Amino acid sequence: MSLLPILYYPDHRLRQISKPVNKINNSIYRIVYDMFDTMYHKNGIGLAAPQVNINLNIIVIDVSENKEQRLVLINPELLAKSGETGIHEGCLSIPEQHGFVPRAKNIKVRALDLNGNSFNLETNDLQAICIQHEMDHLVGKLFIDYLSPLKRQRLLKKMKQLIRNLD
């Protein structure tokens, strides 16, 4: 497989609303496996297709310490949520930056797996937080949208400097 280039904030493509996957085929398999390779290479725990400039409703997640619990969510829908939690989240598209984001502690989602089978998943804690974070990407929302305008402005300034240093 191969590594995919990650889009960095403030790239406008991160704000696009993704499209549903209509058919799961070899192209989708390749995207998913490349997304996992990219996520693991960057030491992430989740990645949404829009972050790698693929405008489709695909999420890959692995919150396990041994990186052996891959989860693929295609066309995910949030069915229920309860409780409150939150952590200082980071994002592969906003490197080296973190901010506290309130999230639901428990969620129930419906999605398709790589075989095109629909499944429901009830989860909590870090996996629930990660799924919510990645689902935000599918509708063009970033963790910084939960921050105060002042914190967002500071973060944007840091990101512009970081991007200049990468070039």
UniProtKB/Swiss-Prot annotation:
Protein task: Removes the formyl group from the N-terminal Met of newly synthesized proteins. Requires at least a dipeptide for an efficient rate of reaction. N-terminal L-methionine is a prerequisite for activity but the enzyme has broad specificity at other positions.
Q: What Gene3D superfamilies does the entry give?
A: Peptide deformylase
| Catalytic reaction equation(s) | N-terminal N-formyl-L-methionyl-[peptide] + H2O = N-terminal L-methionyl-[peptide] + formate
Similarity field: Belongs to the polypeptide deformylase family.
InterPro entries documented for this protein: Peptide_deformylase, Peptide_deformylase_sf
Question: Which keywords label this protein?
Answer: Hydrolase, Iron, Metal-binding, Protein biosynthesis
Q: Give its E.C. classification number.
A: 3.5.1.88
The alphabetized list of GO BP terms reads: co-translational protein modification; translation
Q: Where does Fe cation bind?
A: 91, 133, 137
The name under which this protein is listed is: Peptide deformylase
Q: What Pfam family is a match for this entry?
A: Pep_deformylase
GO terms of molecular function: metal ion binding; peptide deformylase activity
Q: Which cofactor does it need?
A: Fe(2+)
> Can you quote the record's cofactor note?
Binds 1 Fe(2+) ion.
Which SUPFAM superfamilies does the entry link to?
Peptide deformylase
**PANTHER family xref list:** PEPTIDE DEFORMYLASE
Name the active site residues: 134
| Keyword Hydrolase found | yes
Which enzyme class, named as a word? hydrolase
